[in-house]
C-alpha cells in the first residue's frame, strides 16, 4: 500500500539532492515554484525552477546548467529572470502570480531570493487592490473549464472548483491581507494525497480522477470503495469552496472601503417584503421580521429572479428564522417555485442556501444525495449536481407547459430516491408526494408530480424496447401518465432535460425522435383541455378582503387604468386575476405586498376614490408563448410588473380572463369574442410582452 506523504517526501529529497549538485553562476539564486515549492512533489511532477540573477546581462553558461536535470529524466520548466522581471510577473498574469507567491529558495544567493520574494508579496498586495476582479475572473474561467470537484464523477482535483488551486487562492488572499486563513488542512491533505496516488497509478502527471484510478486510490487511502472516497473528496472540496466563497466575500467587503466607493451612490430598492436591493446586493430591510419563516424563501426567490448576489451577512441572519409551518403558506410555496424557475440563477441560489444550512429546511431529502456518486457510467455529475442541471433545463421550458411549478418540482426530485435498495423512481415518487403535501398542493397536483417522478424513465424504456410509432408504445406511455395530458407534457420536457443533464451521448437523435413521436401520438389520443370561465360572485364597486392569508381586491367597473393604477401605486404584485365582462368588468385580483405596507381596506378605498392613481408601468420584455383552445387564447410569460395590464391593453374584446402564477411564470387565459384574427392577436401579444 502506497503512503502518499512518504512518496512526496522521498521525491523531494531526491530532487533537492540533484539540484544541490548544480553549479550556479556567481551571484545567482535558484528558486522553485509550483509543487516543489509547496512540498507537493510526486515522482511524475514537473520541476518549475527560476534562476534569479542581478540586473544586467544574463550570466554565461546558463544553458548548460539544466543538463543534469534532463539527464535524470526529470520534466523541467525553467526561466531566467532578474528580480524586477519576477515582480513584473505579478501584474502580467494572475495564474503566474499565484505561482510566484510560492517562491522557495533552493540554492545560491539566499538573500537575493528572499529580497525578491518580499518584493513579490508587496506587489501582490498592490495588485489585489487594483485588479481584484481580474484575479476572480481568472478563477471563474478555470471553474468553467474544469467544473466543480464536488459535482463531477471525474473530478479535476487541481483545477476544479474546490480543488487545490482554490486552496492556493485562499492562501494568496490571506497573504494579501484580505481575509483570514481558514482551517482547511485536513481537506487539503486529502486532495493532495489523492492526487499523489493518482500520479502513481496513472504513471504520469494527471489531475482528473477517473473511476478506473479511483479504485486503487481508495484502497491506498483505506476507503471501502471509490464511492466512499468520492464522498470524502466532495466534502473536502465543498469545505474549500465554502472557504474561498467566504474569503472572496470578505475581500470584496474590504476593498471598496479602501477606495471609498462604499459610500458613493448608496441606494436601497425594495424587492419583496423585508428584502431590498442595496447597491446591487440583496440584503434584509433595516428592521426585518426574523420570526417570519418564509423570509429565507423570499430572499432566495429574489436572488433567482434578479440574478443579484445575496450578502453573506444576510444568509447568516436567515438562520434565525423559524421553520415553516405545514402546510406551507401559498406565498411561500410560490417563492419556492420561483427559486427553481431561473435557468441561469437557480443552481447558484440553491447551492448558496445549502452552503448556509438553509436548503435542507425546505428539502430535507437533499442531504442524502449531496455528493452522491452515481452508479451509472453515463453520468458525469454527482446526483445533486445532475438534479440541479435538470432543473435548469426544465426552467428553460416553463412557458411551454401548463404547470411549470410541477415541472421544476419533479425535476428537483426525479433522482432524489437514488442510494436506496429499491428502484429510485419509486422512492423519489414517495418523497415528492410528501414534499407536495408539505407545500400545500392539492390532491390532483400531488398525484401529477408523483406520477411524473415515478415514470420519468418511461420514455427511455419505450424507446429502447418498442417502436415509438406503434399503438403498444402509445398505450404504455398513456398508462404511465395515467391518461393525463398535463403530466404527459411535463414528462416530455423532463425526459429531454434529464438526458441532456446526464452526460454526452445520452440525448441522442434516436431518443429525441422516439420522444417526439410517442408523445405526439399520445397527445392526439387525449381530449384537449377546455378552459373554464372563472366564478365571481356579485359585489359592490370596490373592496379588499382576506381569505386564508390571501388578500383579494374585488372590483366592478369600466376603467381598468384606475383600479390597476391603485394596485401598482401601493407596490402590490398581482399573483392571480379573475375577470368577467358583462357590459362592465367584474374582477378579483389576488395581491401580495413588496414592502411593509398594511392591507388597510379603508386606505385602499380612499386611494381608489381619489382618482389620482391611474398610471400603470410598461413591463420589461420577457419570454412569452401563446396557445389556442378554440377562441380562448392562453399566454404564458415571465412574471413581472405590468404584464397583465399590457396584455389586457393589447387584446380585443374578451368574455372573461383568468390569470394565475405558477412559480415565476404568469399564465393568462382569455376567452375572446368572435370576429378576431388569430395571427393579428398573436403578433400584438408577442410584440407587447416579448418585443418581437
Curated annotation (Swiss-Prot):
Co-factor requirement: Mg(2+)
CDD domains (UniProt xref): HDc (cd00077), NT_GlnE_GlnD_like (cd05401)
Keywords: Hydrolase, Magnesium, Multifunctional enzyme, Nucleotidyltransferase, Transferase
UniProt keyword Transferase, yes or no: yes
Residue segments, region Uridylyl-removing: 271-692
Annotated ranges, domain HD: 383-484
GO molecular function, one term: [protein-PII] uridylyltransferase activity
Keyword Chaperone attached: no
EC number, UniProt record: 2.7.7.59, 3.1.4.-
Source domain of life: Bacteria
Pfam families: HD (PF01966), NTP_transf_2 (PF01909)
Activity regulation details: Uridylyltransferase (UTase) activity is inhibited by glutamine, while glutamine activates uridylyl-removing (UR) activity.
Location of region: Uridylyltransferase: 1-270
Catalytic reactions on record: [protein-PII]-L-tyrosine + UTP = [protein-PII]-uridylyl-L-tyrosine + diphosphate; [protein-PII]-uridylyl-L-tyrosine + H2O = [protein-PII]-L-tyrosine + UMP + H(+)
Signal peptide: none
Domain notes: Has two distinct domains: an N-terminal nucleotidyltransferase (NT) domain responsible for UTase activity, and a HD domain that encodes UR activity. Lacks the two C-terminal ACT domains found in GlnD orthologs, that seem to have a role in glutamine sensing.
Purpose: Modifies, by uridylylation and deuridylylation, the PII regulatory proteins (GlnB and homologs), in response to the nitrogen status of the cell that GlnD senses through the glutamine level. Under low glutamine levels, catalyzes the conversion of the PII proteins and UTP to PII-UMP and PPi, while under higher glutamine levels, GlnD hydrolyzes PII-UMP to PII and UMP (deuridylylation). Thus, controls uridylylation state and activity of the PII proteins, and plays an important role in the regulation of nitrogen assimilation and metabolism.
Family the entry assigns: Belongs to the GlnD family.
Stated name of the protein: Bifunctional uridylyltransferase/uridylyl-removing enzyme
Gene: glnD
